[in-house]
């Protein structure tokens, strides 16, 4: 008697690749669907952390999620077919490290910085990215160690460059070529969990820049850029005031030996003398809002008032029976009312009137228009100065502008101080931060409506991609409050200046400099010799630098996702990697779903919304549910053309020795 071996390949060994591996092991342990299984894991970076979360990156770079709300493992809240298998969250793992004896610390192999961070990390602290990478690497080892006895894992520290059916067009066994010359043949399933992939290098913003000796750095992860050649005192312009900006800010200051000290009203910066002279700006002219201090514990979240399961079912049913929805007409009014209700309810509670909250919400939601809702506000004693204003929240600067740089600087420092005060009050207690946290809490509900073409293509392009996604990021996924404090201290120390709203950048050929100005801040424009695009590159399959995705697109084995649009026959081509609904099979140029290829995560942005969000315990994490769906589909496959092996007798689950995890070199 002989049996077949199932051979699987996961391309990408970051958090999503790890989640698929963990879920696949869980399915196989519960019920060994195949007598023998090999899982190849392909990534040039160390498995678990991958490139983005690598452990060697500077310790100045922080996550923007608290430690207790980060995990690799499933729980009872996750809607999935597979078994729940417990494992530590990031904070729970930190507690494990903190409890180690000195001998255990030596045996564990973790460096002093990791152990020190573990001892200091609280449930609501923001970990360094390097520490998260250490967690991911350790969880990868645990998953492999806990794998069922019939499953082996082989790690290939290389880059996948091409994928093909061994028999063209058959949908059978797959062959994957790696950059080191290795060819993985006879693959029964391939899962693409590529994460953030590099984009093609764009040219300089103006052909004059290179000729004038100006340095322009395109959008990228700051940890991937070598900026060591920028000399102290060099004027540097950062275009963007989001999370990427704060990374650059930290690397140019803390990363160059500067330090902050606490004083009664904020921080003071102590320069090292190695900093460049920093200038920054953006369209809004203010940084992302600070995250409110977490008061929701591990899994607390806003319970939807309007975006209920019944309303979501009604909206998705309308889409399936007809054209895509309009975001502005159908979803935005619901989101806006949810946020406003939480703001006003928290405002009443902060005034000692919590008992009136339910009555207010009922009356406010019953209001048919702005006039009706205004009457409700008057009845509950909420005056004009305390009323929620979306325009002011999205663009907080004065409409009339400023008298000059000094006036703008004073206004900005007060804006930053107010943001810190609100953040310190918490994401439940402070009316503004509680309201903005609703946007984060509603992401799953919004995804259920907009994913897989739920919106009309033009509404997806103009309203979701072109407006709401940016607004959502600005208001709800900002940095810790400590970063806003640091920014203010750098402004006060003369290390950083913010140009102002409506940033405009040009080149002065006579002066060989980038020139930046704000139309709302009169005065002498800023001049810089270095321009850094302080943002990540846009996810776009058509402009990716990833060799595997480029090859799949060139050969017609994948395609860019296109959303039908009522007023545009050609629809909206998004640049996202097209996949089916769960379990996310890859779709080729002719619209055919491949039975043995799966993809999820960042490259599928636009098919799915906000794909960069991580897995959180206790809230039915979409990421964990997606990983389980893919793992279940892979485990259900029949081997295509794997070599035959002797019949296998399962000795039961055991903890495999180190030789079960094999690192393969060419």
Swiss-Prot record:
Its EC number is 1.14.13.248. Residues 645-666 are annotated as: Disordered. Its cofactor is FAD. The keyword Acyltransferase does not apply. One of its GO terms (molecular function) is monooxygenase activity. InterPro entries: FAD/NAD-bd_sf, HpyO/CreE_NAD-binding, L-asp_N-monooxygenase_NS-form. One of its GO terms (biological process) is antibiotic biosynthetic process. It comes from the Bacteria. It catalyses: L-aspartate + 3 NADPH + 3 O2 + 2 H(+) = 2-nitrobutanedioate + 3 NADP(+) + 4 H2O. Keywords: Antibiotic biosynthesis, Monooxygenase, NADP, Oxidoreductase. Pathway: Antibiotic biosynthesis. Residues 656-666 have a biased composition (Basic and acidic residues). The keyword Cell membrane does not apply. Pfam families: NAD_binding_9 (PF13454). Part of a gene cluster involved in the biosynthesis of cremeomycin, a light-sensitive o-diazoquinone with antibacterial and antiproliferative effects. Catalyzes the iterative oxidation of L-aspartic acid to nitrosuccinic acid (2-nitrobutanedioate) via N-hydroxyaspartic acid and nitrososuccinic acid. Belongs to the nitrosuccinic acid synthase family. This is L-aspartate N-monooxygenase (nitrosuccinate-forming). It comes from Streptomyces cremeus. The lineage of its organism: Bacteria, Bacillati, Actinomycetota, Actinomycetes, Kitasatosporales. The gene is creE.
């Amino acid at each position: 008697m002989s049996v077949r071996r199932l051979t699987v390949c996961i391309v990408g060994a970051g958090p999503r690749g790890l989640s698929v591996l963990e879920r696949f092991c869980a399915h196989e342990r519960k019920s060994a669907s195949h007598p023998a299984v090999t899982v190849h894991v392909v990534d040039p970076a160390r498995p678990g952390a991958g490139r983005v979360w690598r452990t060697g990156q500077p310790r100045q770079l922080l996550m923007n999620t608290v430690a207790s709300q980060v995990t690799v493992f499933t729980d009872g809240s996750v809607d999935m077919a597979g078994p729940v298998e417990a494992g530590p969250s990031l904070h729970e793992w930190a507690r494990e490290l903190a409890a180690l004896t000195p001998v255990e610390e030596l045996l564990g192999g973790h460096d002093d910085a990791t152990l020190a961070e573990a001892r200091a990390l609280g449930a609501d602290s923001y970990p360094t990215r390097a520490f998260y990478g250490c967690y991911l690497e350790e969880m990868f080892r645990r998953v492999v160690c806990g794998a069922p006895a019939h499953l082996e894992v082989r790690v290939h520290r290389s880059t996948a460059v091409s994928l093909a059916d061994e028999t063209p067009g058959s949908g059978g066994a797959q062959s994957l070529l790696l950059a080191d010359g290795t060819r993985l043949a006879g693959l029964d399933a391939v899962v693409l969990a590529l994460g953030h992939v590099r984009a093609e290098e764009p040219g300089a913003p103006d052909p004059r820049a290179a000729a004038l000796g100006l340095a322009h750095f395109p959008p990228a992860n700051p940890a991937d850029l070598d900026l060591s050649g920028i000399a102290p005192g060099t004027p540097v312009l950062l275009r963007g005031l989001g999370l990427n900006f704060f990374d650059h800010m930290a690397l140019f200051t803390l990363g160059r030996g500067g330090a902050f000290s606490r004083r009664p009203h904020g921080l003071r910066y102590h320069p090292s003398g190695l900093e460049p002279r920093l200038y920054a700006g953006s369209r809004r002219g203010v940084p992302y809002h600070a995250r409110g201090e977490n008061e929701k514990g591990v899994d607390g979240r806003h319970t939807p008032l309007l975006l209920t399961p019944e309303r979501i079912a009604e909206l998705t049913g309308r889409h399936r029976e007809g054209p895509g929805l309009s975001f502005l007409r159908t979803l935005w009014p619901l989101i806006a009312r949810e946020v406003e209700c939480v703001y006003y309810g928290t405002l009443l509670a902060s005034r000692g009137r919590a008992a009136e909250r339910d009555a207010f919400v009922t009356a406010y939601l019953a209001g048919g228009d702005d006039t009706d809702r205004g009457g409700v506000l008057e009845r509950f004693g909420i005056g004009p100065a305390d009323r929620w204003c979306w325009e002011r929240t999205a663009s907080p600067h004065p409409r009339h502008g400023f008298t000059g740089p000094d006036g703008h600087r004073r206004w900005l420092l007060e804006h930053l101080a107010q943001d810190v005060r609100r953040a310190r009050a918490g994401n439940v207690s402070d009316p503004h931060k509680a309201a903005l946290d609703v946007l984060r809490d509603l992401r799953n509900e919004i995804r259920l409506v907009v994913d897989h073409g739920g919106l009309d293509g033009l509404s997806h392009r103009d309203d979701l991609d072109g407006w709401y996604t940016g607004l959502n990021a600005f208001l709800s996924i900002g940095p810790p409050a400590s970063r806003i404090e640091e920014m203010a201290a750098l402004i006060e120390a003369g290390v950083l200046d913010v140009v102002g709203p409506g940033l405009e950048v040009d080149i002065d050929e006579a002066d060989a400099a980038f020139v930046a100005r704000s139309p709302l801040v009169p005065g002498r424009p800023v001049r810089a010799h270095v321009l850094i695009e302080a943002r990540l590159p846009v996810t776009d399959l058509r402009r990716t630098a990833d060799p595997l995705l480029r090859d799949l697109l060139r050969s017609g084995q994948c395609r860019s996702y296109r959303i039908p649009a009522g007023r545009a026959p050609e629809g909206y081509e998004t640049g996202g990697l097209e996949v089916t609904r769960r379990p996310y099979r890859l779709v080729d140029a002719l619209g055919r779903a491949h039975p043995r290829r799966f993809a999820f995560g960042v490259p599928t942005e636009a098919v799915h919304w906000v794909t960069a969000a991580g897995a959180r315990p206790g809230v039915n994490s979409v990421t964990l549910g997606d990983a389980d769906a893919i793992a279940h589909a892979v485990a259900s496959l029949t081997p295509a053309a794997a070599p035959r092996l002797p019949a296998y007798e399962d000795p039961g689950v055991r903890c495999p020795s180190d030789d079960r995890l094999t690192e393969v070199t060419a």
